[in-house]
């Protein structure tokens, strides 16, 4: 039987790379598939340990990538534009590598993370069927429902909020057109058009989009017909034995994980300060603050009797051992809390995190507070501790188990390849 050659393209950011890796990892044992993964050299070791054949991208440009990917403060309109502009040079470098590689070794299908623009742009140019994996399930524009990236718009409660959300969708549309116009010269090589004839964004696959998340918590409506929900798959992939933390020595305290992920370096000092304030007020809890620095020797420092700072903790292994989680609203940690039935306090910082926070609150699985307000955080944490029953969380925990991500991925792979055959 002829092998199906699959090339995966994802930036070396945990929140983007790991969900796509977890979708594909079960296929590594299937002799029907030949899978290669294009990602940054800084993630080469951890991806190879899972079993992927890795082709590094942006070798020699790690510093430039880290500078573009890790902003020094919360993004605004101007800083977001600058970040995108700086990223375009890197996007073109990756595109050049993909064109060269795919000219010599063309895959049958490409699977591309939703912000790794090079993969989709080049696949479309070369006539390669491709699938978008969307770790931020609501990033795509839709025809109805709460728009994202406006500070966390929830379900509209009145006609004014309905109008606000309508205008926000229009602003999103206009803003993207303006940015595309400003960058038109640098995008010319791709013959880039922002929207297709159907009015859908061309940076995502016109054939198949896999939403890595749960429809049950989504506030948007009007997704494209080729958008499929595959459930959450953003678990960490690091080996737990590399990050040894014995939680059995804290039997009489509530255990609380505190994290703002692997990015947001500018936010981590404030997070530690807020954790210290909570630790002072709650001696019956032990707080474990993770700095999100993986791939290095594990470190654990006890700053207070009931507060420990660790370099990194794989969520999949340690969240089940916690009682509560305080996090930033990243997609991965948001769903890990649901999967393991852990109530959360969300302190959104940037990007899509305000949108995940409002979804968590409306779903009844989390509280939320402003990240730099000790008073608001303290009050929200008191509410978190006081709430004894979490029926919505249990319902969603069970719903999360009903998804079959890899099965859906396989169906889409074969559907696209069959469609390609029909075109011949």
Predicted features and spans:
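C-terminal amphipathic helix plus adjacent low-complexity
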Residues: 376-424
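N-terminal subdomain of nucleotide-sugar transferases
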Residues: 1-56
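Conserved nucleotide-sugar donor-interacting segment of glycosyltransferase catalytic cores
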Residues: 88-163, 216
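Donor-nucleotide binding loops and adjacent catalytic segments primarily
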Residues: 213-324
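Conserved nucleotide-sugar phosphate-binding/catalytic loop shared by glycosyltransferases and other
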Residues: 37-81, 162
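A donor-sugar binding/catalytic signature common to diverse glycosyltransferases
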Residues: 24, 110-112, 312-358
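Active-site-proximal region of nucleotide-activated glycan assembly enzymes
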Residues: 131-219
């Amino acid at each position: 039987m002829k092998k199906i050659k699959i090339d995966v393209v994802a930036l070396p950011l945990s929140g983007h790379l790991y969900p796509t890796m977890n979708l594909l990892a079960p296929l590594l044992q299937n002799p029907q598939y030949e899978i290669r993964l294009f990602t940054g050299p800084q993630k080469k070791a951890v991806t190879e340990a899972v079993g992927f054949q890795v082709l590094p991208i942006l070798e020699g440009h790690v510093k430039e990538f880290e500078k573009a990917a890790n902003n020094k403060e919360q993004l605004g309109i101007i800083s977001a534009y600058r970040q995108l502009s700086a990223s375009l040079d890197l996007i073109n470098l990756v595109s050049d590598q993909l064109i060269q590689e795919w000219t010599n070794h063309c895959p049958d299908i490409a699977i591309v993370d939703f912000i790794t623009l090079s993969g989709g742009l080049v696949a479309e140019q070369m006539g390669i069927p491709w699938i978008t994996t969307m770790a931020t399930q609501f990033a795509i524009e839709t025809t109805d429902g709460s728009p994202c990236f406006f500070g966390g718009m929830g379900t509209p409660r009145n006609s004014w909020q309905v109008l606000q959300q309508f205008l926000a969708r229009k602003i999103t549309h206009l803003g993207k057109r303006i940015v595309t116009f400003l960058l038109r010269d640098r995008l010319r090589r791709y013959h880039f058009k922002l929207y297709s004839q159907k009015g859908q964004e061309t940076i995502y696959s016109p054939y198949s989009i896999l939403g890595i998340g749960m429809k049950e918590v989504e506030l948007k409506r009007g997704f494209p017909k080729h958008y499929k929900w595959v459930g959450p798959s953003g678990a960490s992939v690091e080996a737990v034995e590399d990050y040894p933390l014995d939680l059995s020595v804290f039997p009489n305290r509530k255990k609380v994980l505190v994290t703002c992920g692997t990015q947001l370096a500018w936010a981590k000092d404030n997070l530690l300060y807020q954790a210290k304030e909570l630790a002072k007020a709650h001696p019956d809890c032990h707080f474990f603050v993770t700095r999100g620095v993986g791939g290095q020797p594990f470190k654990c420092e006890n700053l207070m009797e009931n507060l420990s700072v660790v370099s990194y903790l794989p969520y999949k292994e340690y969240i089940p051992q916690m009682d509560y989680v305080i996090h930033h609203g990243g997609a991965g940690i948001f769903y890990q809390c649901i999967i393991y039935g852990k109530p959360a306090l969300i302190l959104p910082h940037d990007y899509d995190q305000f949108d995940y926070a409002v979804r968590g609150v409306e779903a009844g699985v989390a509280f939320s507070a402003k990240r730099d307000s000790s008073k608001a955080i303290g009050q929200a944490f008191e509410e978190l501790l006081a709430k004894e029953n979490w029926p919505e969380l249990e319902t969603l925990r069970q719903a999360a188990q009903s998804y079959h991500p890899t099965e859906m991925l396989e169906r889409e792979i074969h559907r696209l390849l069959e469609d390609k055959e029909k075109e011949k």
